[in-house]
């Protein structure tokens, strides 16, 4: 599994399982709202009054309506900031 998928899939799956309403902002600024019905490598199926298939490459941000508890893979990616004095 690609490193990017190790966080994305558990996050989207938690949103789908718990049926948490989301706002999805597209790269062109459009805001879509609904619940994630399904997703795969390339698209998210968003459920509202109608179902919309949204291509992931068009998505800028996914904002849940409430906090999400999910178990993403925790990897040491060496992006921690140095402690004070260790610059």
Curated annotation (Swiss-Prot):
Keywords: RNA-binding, Stress response
Entry-linked Pfam families: Hfq (PF17209)
Presence of keyword DNA-binding: no
Domain Sm, residue spans: 9-68
GO cellular component, one term: cytosol
InterPro entries xrefs: Hfq, LSM_dom_sf, Sm
Matching SUPFAM superfamilies: Sm-like ribonucleoproteins
GO annotation terms (biological process): regulation of DNA-templated transcription; regulation of RNA stability; regulation of translation, ncRNA-mediated
GO terms for MF: RNA binding
CDD domains: Hfq
Family in the record: Belongs to the Hfq family.
Role summary: RNA chaperone that binds small regulatory RNA (sRNAs) and mRNAs to facilitate mRNA translational regulation in response to envelope stress, environmental stress and changes in metabolite concentrations. Also binds with high specificity to tRNAs.
Assembly with partners or alone: Homohexamer.
Name of the protein: RNA-binding protein Hfq
Species of origin: Pseudoalteromonas translucida (strain TAC 125)
């Amino acid at each position: 599994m690609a490193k990017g998928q190790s966080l994305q899939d558990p996050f989207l799956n938690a949103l789908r399982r718990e049926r948490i309403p989301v706002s999805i902002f597209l790269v062109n600024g459009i805001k879509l709202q609904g619940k994630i019905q399904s997703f795969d490598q390339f698209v998210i199926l968003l459920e509202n009054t109608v179902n919309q298939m949204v291509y992931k490459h068009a998505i800028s941000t996914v904002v849940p309506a409430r906090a999400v508890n999910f178990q993403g893979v925790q990897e040491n990616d060496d992006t921690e900031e140095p402690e004070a004095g260790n610059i």
